[in-house]
């Protein structure tokens, strides 16, 4: 055994410079040495200060020189920690040292040359992982089978519990990514735990997690619960004797509350019990013996898991970098600020609440223009009409809102609105076709019904097109024109009603020709809806000579 101890000391002296050059970061090697009591607290702080002044290789070279003066047990522990998986992943140059390590040297031998520490310092040391595991099992003395078979009934819902998963005993270590890609969990400290929702008021369903031990970037080693891909750290599993030591290293206090993506669960049995549901994740129940929580925001970004200048959410413990937000912020906003998860959770919570029954409302009255009323709306029943004065620019009629399936305007009502161009004159419509010959070249628009037609097809005996106010054969027949002058049928004396303005109480509107689908689509593409409304308002301002007065 003595020969093996001397061999380890000689190997450390031989590879001291190589190890110091391979260590380019104090974490996780230095923190692991402090956690396993290989490096005391004062030497830990001294190495960190030296790293800031001279660099990491020089600081570790001085630490290894000091370690050569220690007993053989400390050197054995150093080699064990150095060749752990997370150190080999973090420091790739250590593989060459491991490959050249003598095969006959056993690093698993027991430590006999090191005396256990006694006195007050021994009380400050954190217990070994097996002791922690035993402490974890004591609060949950109920067997998993009993918890799984236990059913809790709540009003309006039936809860089901899942059987606990079997712990995987062949997993020695599990590596989890942090901001720098390093996060480790101790081996053989995983156990499936199923908690019924009835144990904690305000929770729904059963939450199943795995108790694990986690080593964080700051060097702290704590118990946490794994639920899916998330890890939550209850304050109960923190060792009280090790908090002072961990606080001195990390410079920040531990988070004592169990967090499940924004959900907070306080201690059952207190006067105030609050359960915050955010992001739609069910809250994780806390243990009955958990101490009073002290709400604080996290000291790392919830997106990239890195520190720095963070903006804290006022609705949950999360914190974010301004650049990690979506969309990113340029500066910290003033007043209260909530993250997208809190806002989404509020919307989902409002939608999940039952709506208060309201008395049935009367059908809304929709004011529409008189000139835009279709023929089908006139036969739906009596309507309340306002008495219009002679100098009114626009006349409105209050109609009961029609059925959603019924269109407000029919193609026959849109024909006169879309017939005029920018100058109020009919023009050629390339996409429309004549109703007689079916040809779409050089077609004209009727000034009354906006139907596409050829002059030669509707009036083959006419010599030329008189005027610009052209009408098709059907519209000219209604107004009794002469075949040679169909566009002059409208009298010029007296006020002329707007084309397409439906008369109140007149049933002749149902005889308006219906546009084909191609004609209607072409008209809608050529004219905007604002132009249609503007035309309607201008047309409605003209006095209606043929319209009877409205009844009061």
From Swiss-Prot:
PTMs per UniProt: Phosphorylated.
Zinc finger (PHD-type): 298-345, 434-475
Basic and acidic residues bias (residue ranges): 504-514
UniProt keyword Repeat present: yes
HSR domain residues: 1-106
GO biological process, one term: negative thymic T cell selection
Molecular functions (GO terms): chromatin binding; histone binding; identical protein binding; RNA polymerase II transcription regulatory region sequence-specific DNA binding; translation regulator activity; zinc ion binding
Renumbered ranges of motif LXXLL motif 2: 64-68
Entries under SUPFAM superfamilies matching the protein: FYVE/PHD zinc finger, SAND domain-like
UniProt key word Cytoplasm: yes
CDD domains: PHD1_AIRE (cd15539), PHD2_AIRE (cd15540)
Residue window of motif LXXLL motif 4: 520-524
Region (Disordered): 109-177, 472-514
Organism superkingdom: Eukaryota
Chain span(s) of sequence motif LXXLL motif 1: 8-12
One cellular-component annotation, GO: nucleus
Keywords of the record: Activator, Cytoplasm, DNA-binding, Metal-binding, Nucleus, Phosphoprotein, Repeat, Transcription, Transcription regulation, Zinc, Zinc-finger
Role: Transcription factor playing an essential role to promote self-tolerance in the thymus by regulating the expression of a wide array of self-antigens that have the commonality of being tissue-restricted in their expression pattern in the periphery, called tissue restricted antigens (TRA). Binds to G-doublets in an A/T-rich environment; the preferred motif is a tandem repeat of 5'-. ATTGGTTA-3' combined with a 5'-TTATTA-3' box. Binds to nucleosomes.
Record's subunit section: Homodimer and homotetramer. Interacts with CREBBP. Interacts preferentially with histone H3 that is not methylated at 'Lys-4'. Binds with lower affinity to histone H3 that is monomethylated at 'Lys-4'. Trimethylation of histone H3 at 'Lys-4' or phosphorylation at 'Thr-3' abolish the interaction. Binds with lower affinity to histone H3 that is acetylated at 'Lys-4', or that is acetylated at 'Lys-9' or trimethylated at 'Lys-9'. Binds histone H3 that is dimethylated at 'Arg-2' with very low affinity.
Entry remark concerning the domains of this protein: Interacts via the first PHD domain with the N-terminus of histone H3 that is not methylated at 'Lys-4'. Disruption of the first PHD domain has been shown to lead to reduced transcriptional activity and to localization of the protein mainly in the cytoplasm in small granules. While the PHD zinc fingers are necessary for the transactivation capacity of the protein, other regions also modulate this function. The L-X-X-L-L repeats may be implicated in binding to nuclear receptors.
Protein name: Autoimmune regulator
Organism for this UniProt entry: Mus musculus (Mouse)
Gene field: Aire
């Amino acid at each position: 055994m003595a020969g093996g101890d001397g061999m380890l000391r000689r190997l450390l002296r031989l590879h001291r410079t190589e190890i110091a050059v391979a260590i380019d970061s104090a974490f996780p090697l230095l923190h692991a040495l402090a956690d396993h009591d290989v490096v005391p607290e004062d030497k830990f702080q001294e190495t960190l200060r030296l790293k800031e002044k001279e660099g990491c290789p020089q600081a570790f070279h001085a630490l290894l020189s000091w370690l050569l003066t220690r007993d053989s047990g400390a050197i054995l522990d150093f080699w064990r920690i150095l060749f752990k998986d997370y150190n080999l992943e973090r420091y790739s140059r250590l593989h060459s040292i491991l490959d050249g390590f003598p095969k006959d040297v056993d690093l698993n031998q027991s430590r006999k040359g090191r005396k256990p520490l006694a006195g007050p310092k021994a009380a400050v040391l954190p217990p070994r992982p097996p002791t922690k595991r035993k402490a974890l099992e004591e609060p949950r003395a109920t067997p998993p089978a009993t918890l799984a078979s236990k059913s809790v009934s709540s009003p309006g819902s039936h809860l089901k519990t899942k059987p606990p998963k079997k712990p995987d005993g062949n997993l020695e270590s599990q590596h989890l990514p942090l901001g720098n890609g390093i996060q480790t969990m101790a081996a053989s400290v995983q156990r499936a735990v199923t908690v019924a929702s009835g144990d904690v008021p305000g929770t729904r369903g059963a939450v199943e997690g795995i108790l694990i031990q986690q080593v964080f970037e700051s060097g702290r080693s704590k118990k946490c619960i794994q639920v899916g891909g998330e890890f939550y750290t209850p304050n109960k599993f923190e060792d009280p004797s090790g908090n002072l030591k961990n606080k001195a290293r990390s410079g920040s206090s531990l988070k004592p509350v169990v967090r499940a993506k924004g959900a907070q669960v306080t201690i059952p049995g207190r006067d105030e019990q609050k359960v915050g549901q955010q992001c739609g994740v069910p809250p994780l129940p806390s243990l009955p013996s958990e101490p009073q929580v002290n709400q604080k925001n996290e000291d790392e970004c919830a997106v990239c898991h890195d520190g720095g200048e963070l903006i804290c959410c006022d609705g949950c413990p999360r914190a974010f970098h301004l650049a990690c937000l979506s969309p990113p912020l340029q500066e910290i906003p003033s007043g209260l600020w909530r993250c997208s998860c809190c806002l989404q959770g509020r919307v989902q919570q409002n939608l999940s609440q039952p709506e208060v029954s309201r008395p049935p409302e009367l059908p809304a009255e929709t004011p529409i223009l008189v000139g835009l009323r279709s023929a089908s709306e006139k036969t739906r029943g009596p309507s309340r009409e306002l008495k219009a004065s002679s100098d009114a620019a626009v006349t409105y009629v209050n109609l009961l809102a029609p059925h959603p399936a019924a269109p407000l305007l029919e193609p026959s009502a849109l024909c006169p609105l879309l017939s005029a161009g920018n100058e109020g004159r009919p023009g050629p419509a390339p996409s429309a076709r004549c109703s007689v010959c079916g040809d779409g070249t050089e077609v004209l628009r009727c000034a009354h019904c906006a139907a596409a037609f050829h002059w030669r097809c509707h009036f083959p005996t006419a010599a030329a097109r008189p005027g610009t106010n052209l009408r098709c054969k059907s519209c000219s027949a209604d107004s009794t024109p002469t075949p040679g002058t169909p566009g002059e049928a409208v009298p010029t004396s007296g006020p002329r009603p707007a084309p397409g303005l439906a008369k109140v109480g007149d049933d002749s509107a149902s005889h308006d020709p219906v546009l084909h689908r191609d004609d209607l689509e072409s008209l809608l593409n050529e004219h905007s809806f604002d132009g249609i409304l503007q035309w309607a308002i201008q047309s409605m301002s003209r006095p209606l000579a043929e319209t009877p007065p409205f009844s009061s």
